[in-house]
Amino acid sequence: MPTYNEITLAKELIRFPSITPVDAGVMKFLAKKLTDIGFKCKILEFKDKNSIPVKNLYARLGNSQPNFMFAGHLDVVPPGNIKDWTIKPFSPTIKKNSSYW
């Protein structure tokens, strides 16, 4: 079973410009990582009659109880004017023990 470094994984995830409704591949990326460590994953698409389709990742590990559920999100807000950034968005950077996400 593979192991993952938390900082490396966080940097990989941050590189995806996953601005709703475009997930930029982050769902498939995370599903692959979770599948590699034993999860069964499904990417589900939800659409309200007045909205655009939005993808969600459903991942399950095992079938026994008790069950544990974690809910999070993989989308980000639009970065706005790129010229206003000192560190480019979607470019995770660590400088002198400070992180810029």
Region spans (language model):
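A non-catalytic alpha/beta surface segment that caps or lines the substrate-entry region
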Residues: 19-66, 86-91
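Acidic active-site catalytic centers that drive phospho-/nucleotidyl reactions
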Residues: 7-9, 23, 75, 97
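Active-site metal-coordination/substrate-binding segment of hydrolases
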Residues: 67-101
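N-terminal glycine-rich anion-binding loops that anchor highly charged ligand groups
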Residues: 4
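Generic N-terminal amphipathic, Lys/Arg-enriched alpha-helix
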Residues: 7-17
